[in-house]
Amino acid sequence: METTATSTHEFSDATRVLTSVLAPLEKRTLLWLAARMPRAINSDHLTALALAAMAMAGLSYWWARYSPFGLAAVIVCLAINWFGDSLDGTIARVRQHQRPRYGFYVDHVVDMFGIAFLVGGMGVSGYMHPFVALGLLATYFMLSAEIYL
């Protein structure tokens, strides 16, 4: 006898709460950027940019093992990640192209891969012991599972 479970829970939109000192400035900046972003660029493009920037940040940490310019490259990559990761949801809301479940899922999956690239790069950089990086990554994943679920 086969039974199917049905969920009685409704998916509700999450309210984005910015609480940092720079939150008002960040919100105004993101809205300004979203209003001026070319129509050909959508939220998926910005999400991909954010992931690529995190991968490059990880590679830049590896490069820092051989050259101090790698650390400067990490900073640039993290700024590009902020641009893509913060602006993807903003542009979707401004253009009324929200996909709450899909967007929530993709955002968090991309964040998981991004942090793996970043912390992996730290672990091979020589600036952090690989076991410390592994512990940091495991802790991040456990805390993320607690928060997202």
List each model region and its residues:
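Structural signature of transmembrane alpha-helix termini at the membrane-water interface
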Residues: 56-66, 85-87, 120-124, 142, ...
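Acidic (Asp/Glu-rich) catalytic motifs at the cytosolic membrane interface
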Residues: 76-120, 146
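A feature for the membrane-embedded catalytic helix bundles of lipid/isoprenoid biosynthetic enzymes
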Residues: 1-37, 108-149
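Topogenic membrane-insertion module of multi-pass membrane proteins
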Residues: 1-79
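A generic membrane alpha-helix/interface feature
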Residues: 60-62, 68, 103-106, 125, ...
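The feature captures the transmembrane alpha-helix scaffold of multi-pass secondary transporters
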Residues: 68-75, 101, 130-134
